[in-house]
């Protein structure tokens, strides 16, 4: 059968895999964003702490995704847990780096003005610094999401959810009549999801970033 016939015959399974793939990436991005922004908030005032945070999260990205998942399997088993841990760790670097850069880039005069009207440090952070640092943080989230879309496909190695299962099934059956269709379906599905997520981030940016500070 040709590719379109294959999509029609497998559309329910493909939609299920696509939903699981998108859900895994979304949930891991939420966790990575919370952790990454927290690390940025804790470390941005100190040069050495910021460098340490960036270096540590950069080091994680040097570990091949298959190796990372392989190391996690004996600890947390197969399925969702190694997928969630690996994706969350891989998603940290762009968020941590951009959170630090964004917070350090806030105009000190604005912080001084907030202090002058009686704002406490936590209030300054929440009401002045984080909103002004939001554009680079959102950019970091977008970059992380695009990275995780591809890395999530490797989760099929650990029986994880997502479109990677379709790709791995095709690779395992190379030479069969549907092998290429399986690989193409999984790959194109991931590309479509990545584009949809990026479009959503553009919309979020339009809605949450004041026009005066848009980059």
Q: What role is predicted for each listed range?
A:
Residues 26, 89, 121-154, 201:
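Transmembrane alpha-helices
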Residues 22, 26, 30-38, 42, ...:
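Generic alpha-helical transmembrane segments of integral inner-membrane proteins
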Residues 87, 140-195, 199:
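Non-cytoplasmic
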Residues 16-24, 73-94, 182-186:
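Loop-to-helix entry region at the N-terminal start of transmembrane alpha-helices
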Residues 1-29, 169-180:
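Periplasmic/extracellular loop-to-transmembrane helix junction in inner-membrane transport proteins
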Residues 98, 102-137:
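Short cytoplasmic-facing helical segments at TM-TM junctions of multi-pass membrane proteins
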């Amino acid at each position: 059968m040709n590719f379109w016939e294959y999509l029609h015959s497998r559309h329910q399974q493909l939609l299920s895999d696509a939903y699981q793939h998108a859900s895994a990436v979304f949930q891991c991005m939420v966790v990575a964003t919370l952790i990454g922004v927290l690390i940025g908030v804790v470390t941005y005032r100190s040069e050495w702490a910021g460098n340490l945070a960036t270096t540590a999260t950069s080091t994680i990205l040097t570990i091949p995704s298959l190796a990372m998942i392989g190391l996690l399997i004996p600890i947390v088993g197969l399925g969702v847990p190694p997928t969630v841990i690996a994706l969350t760790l891989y998603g940290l670097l762009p968020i941590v780096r951009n959170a630090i850069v964004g917070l350090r880039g806030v105009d000190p005069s604005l912080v001084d003005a907030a202090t002058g009207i009686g704002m406490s440090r936590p209030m300054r952070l929440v009401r002045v610094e984080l909103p002004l640092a939001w554009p680079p943080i959102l950019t970091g989230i977008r970059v992380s999401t695009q990275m995780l879309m591809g890395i999530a496909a490797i989760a099929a190695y650990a029986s994880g959810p997502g479109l990677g299962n379709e790709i791995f099934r095709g690779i395992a059956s190379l030479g069969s009549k549907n092998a290429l269709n399986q690989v193409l379906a999984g790959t194109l599905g991931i590309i479509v999801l990545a584009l949809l997520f990026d479009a959503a981030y553009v919309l979020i940016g339009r809605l949450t970033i004041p026009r005066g500070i848009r980059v």
